[in-house]
Swiss-Prot record:
Keywords: Acyltransferase, Transferase. CoA binds at residues 66-68, 74, 108-110. It comes from the Bacteria. It holds the Pfam family Acetyltransf_1. CDD domains: NAT_SF. This is Acetyltransferase Atu2258. Catalyzes the transfer of an acetyl group from acetyl coenzyme A (AcCoA) to an acceptor substrate and releases both CoA and the acetylated product. It prefers glucosamine 6-phosphate or dopamine. It can also use the thialysine, N(8)-acetylspermidine, chloramphenicol, puromycin, polymyxin B, and 4-aminobutyrate ethyl ester.
């Protein structure tokens, strides 16, 4: 047995690790009901300028990315995106949502929207911390 440390991505090795892990998780937890959930902010020319990227799975909404263009900030767009995602997640039978952030401004926005801190890690090398939050519906 050899252990090989590398700083180069190896798609073949990743697949060899991922596939049996996915099979194990399927056997242990059953099929996932994961569904993507994306909300885009588009310009008049239909180009995407921001939005929300996430998914629902196993009764929870995960908000992976949320971006509002700087010129649109402070206009209630982030809460609108979160509300739209929450509404769809409820329709899908979710009991809550979770999100993580390193941005102190985003953290305040999420807390104002009803998310509560459930954990943090830090300081990171940048001096910031990463915070995980949840909101139960």
């Amino acid at each position: 047995m050899n252990f090989v440390l590398s700083d180069v991505a190896d798609a073949e090795a990743e697949k060899a690790i991922r596939d049996p892990l996915v099979a194990y998780n399927l056997a242990r937890f059953g099929e996932s009901d994961k569904r993507d959930l994306n909300i885009t902010i588009r310009n008049d020319d239909n180009s995407v300028t921001g939005g929300l990227v996430g998914h629902t799975a196993r009764g929870w909404l995960y908000v992976q990315l949320l971006f509002v263009p700087e010129a649109m900030r402070g206009q209630g767009i982030a809460p609108k995106l979160l509300a739209m995602a929450e509404e769809e997640a409820r329709k899908r039978g979710c009991m809550g949502a979770y999100i993580d952030t390193m941005n102190p401004d985003a953290l305040r926005t999420y807390e104002r929207y009803g998310f509560t801190k459930i954990g943090s890690l830090g300081p990171l090398s940048s001096g910031q911390s990463i915070t995980w939050l949840e909101k139960r519906f």
